[in-house]
């Protein structure tokens, strides 16, 4: 409707070429940190005049933004299926790690693996119950015959790291989020015996939606990046 018309009009006036194009993207936090920021940096070095307009949304909101024509592309971080005319493409895998602050230093044992059963009595930090990540963790605990009942629930992934750093509990986050704090020793990784499955960063787009020159070129760039 209106959103598509407004965006279409904006595209026509601005997207004569790659010299002044705009790419509209909806992305989850994890997709941004684990893939998209790096990809945009590389693309920007080739096409410095292309602008990005980024909405930071949940997976569900990002898929809906593509459906409604609000964005050209969505980058999400959950294993999901989409129905035509939407298409999805797996861009890369990523894995979550379990981290702790120094309050629970007894779990820092030179690479020794700890079972989930041993960890379940500790305080836990996680995302809220309606999120895909939380459902993923609930299933992981259930598969290991345990119930996941976090003591603290947060709205976004990037809030988990400071909460862990302040010794409020243990938390799973994508490895990329914790690099600096792991190196500085503010948090440490707990090796868990029961391996958490890898997850995917996924690109979603609408086959029937007319995309800008810049958005098409960005997709082509991402495809070549995989080779």
Predicted regions and their residues:
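Alpha-helical "hinge/linker" immediately C-terminal to small N-terminal DNA-binding modules
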Residues: 1-14
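Central regulatory/effector-binding core of bacterial HTH transcription factors
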Residues: 20-82, 154
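A late-sequence structural motif
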Residues: 35, 188-227
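Ligand-binding cleft/hinge of the Venus flytrap
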Residues: 39-48, 116, 134-147
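Hydrophobic hinge/microswitch elements
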Residues: 58-63, 67-71, 77, 136-189
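Flexible hinge/capping segments at coil-to-helix
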Residues: 85-124
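Short beta-strand->loop
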Residues: 87-97, 184-198
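Secondary-structure junction motif
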Residues: 107-108, 122-144, 211-213, 219
């Amino acid at each position: 409707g209106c959103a598509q018309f407004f965006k279409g009009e904006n595209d026509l006036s601005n997207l004569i070429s790659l010299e002044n194009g705009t790419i509209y993207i909806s992305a989850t936090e994890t997709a941004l940190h684990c893939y998209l920021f790096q990809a945009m940096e590389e693309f920007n070095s080739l096409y410095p005049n292309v602008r990005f307009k980024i909405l930071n949304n949940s997976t569900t909101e990002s898929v809906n933004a593509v459906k409604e024509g609000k964005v050209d592309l969505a980058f999400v971080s959950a294993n999901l299926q989409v129905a035509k005319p939407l298409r999805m493409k797996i861009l890369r895998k990523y894995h979550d790690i379990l981290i702790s602050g120094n309050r629970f230093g007894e779990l820092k044992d030179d690479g020794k693996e700890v079972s989930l059963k041993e960890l379940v009595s500790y305080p836990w930090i996680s995302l809220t119950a309606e999120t895909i990540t939380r459902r993923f963790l609930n299933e992981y605990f259930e598969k290991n015959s345990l119930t996941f009942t976090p003591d603290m629930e947060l709205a976004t992934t990037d809030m988990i790291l400071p909460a862990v750093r302040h010794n409020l509990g243990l938390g799973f986050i994508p490895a990329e989020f914790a690099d600096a704090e792991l190196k500085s020793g503010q948090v440490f990784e707990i090796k868990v015996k029961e391996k958490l499955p890898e997850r995917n960063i996924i690109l979603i787009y609408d086959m029937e939606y007319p995309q800008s020159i810049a958005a098409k070129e960005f997709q082509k760039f991402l495809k070549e990046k995989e080779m």
